[in-house]
Regions:
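Solvent-exposed soluble domains appended to multi-pass membrane proteins
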Residues: 1-295
Length: 295
């Protein structure tokens, strides 16, 4: 199991994860929160603009993960199986880090997928992981360090996408999709671990936001269970200092990701996020989730 190989900031064997604040509870908001430490609220952009394709996402005044890595010589690639313009993702990642973008339209243009091919949001995660292997090998042969970011989509609501790798293990479709996604991610991580570049590579796995299908949630999840997003840092050169069950949000992943690369962060805070490898308290640990979320 991948969780046994990495760090999710728990004290024992119980799986931990990140709380999600308002403004970070949809894909674009989640990706911005995890890379800049801020919630994406109406003071920044009208959320209605993020419901389709847009290039109007212009967030000034932030210094994001992508900005920092670009300034330190990293080559950065974002790979997604949908259209990057959806929700303003292309605009954000090009403005903050000068990411090269490989998306559904890129795959059509370079004939990685056949003309007219479209399933689910564009192309399925099985293809995304295959394309990502080729890109990782290409990047590893260059002199610059690299940041390769993938956004999977097969587990998106409603019910997820059943690909050719999915088994019929469970009575409902979404559980089968979840199981398939877990196997694919584990296989991709195992592949990375077999490559020469792995020794100097940190892997960060994180969910963007909570699943939104109320029918599945009410049927399959205990109402007393505290839902969080999955978080796992694998092969980081530094170790956790505070060996308790950390209470943290996806905003804390911004400084924590930098710290996982060996970056020394003065004060161990960036944006509204706290470096979880440090002994500094997060906003949730200081004030509680409900208080912070209401602000």
């Amino acid at each position: 199991m991948l969780v046994q190989q990495g760090c999710d900031f728990s004290a024992g064997n119980k799986l931990n994860g990140a709380y999600v604040f308002n403004g970070n509870d949809f894909t674009t908001g989640a990706m911005i929160g995890q890379t800049s430490g801020i919630p994406l609220n109406s003071n920044i952009i009208n959320s209605n603009k993020l419901l389709g394709n847009t290039d109007e996402l212009n967030i000034k005044g932030i210094y994001s993960l992508g900005d920092i890595l670009e300034d330190n010589g990293y080559k950065q690639i974002l790979m997604i199986g949908s259209e990057a313009e959806f929700g303003g993702r292309r605009a954000y990642f090009e403005q903050h880090g000068n990411y090269g973008i490989f998306d559904y339209n890129s795959a059509l243009e370079n004939h990685s997928i056949p003309e007219g091919y479209k399933v689910w949001w564009g192309f399925e995660d099985e293809k995304l992981f295959s394309f990502a292997k080729d890109k990782a090998l290409e990047l590893s042969k260059e002199e610059e360090p690299f940041n390769l970011t993938l956004l999977t989509a097969d587990t998106h609501f409603t019910d997820g996408y059943v690909c050719e790798l999915c088994n019929n293990e469970f009575p409902d479709q979404y559980s089968n999709v979840l199981s398939c996604a877990s196997r694919q991610i584990e296989a991709f991580v195992s592949w990375i671990q077999e490559q020469d570049f792995y020794e100097n590579t940190t892997i960060v796995i994180c969910g963007d936001h909570l699943y939104m299908d109320a029918v599945y949630i009410n049927k399959c999840i205990d109402p007393n269970y505290q839902r969080k997003t999955y978080v796992n840092f694998i092969n980081s050169p530094i170790q956790q200092k505070n060996f308790t069950n950390r209470e943290y949000s996806t905003l804390d992943l911004y400084p924590t990701t930098l710290a996982s690369l060996g970056v020394d962060i003065e004060g161990d805070r960036l944006g509204l996020g706290t470096n979880l490898f440090s002994d500094k308290q997060t906003l949730i640990e200081m004030l509680g989730y409900e208080k912070v979320n209401s602000e």
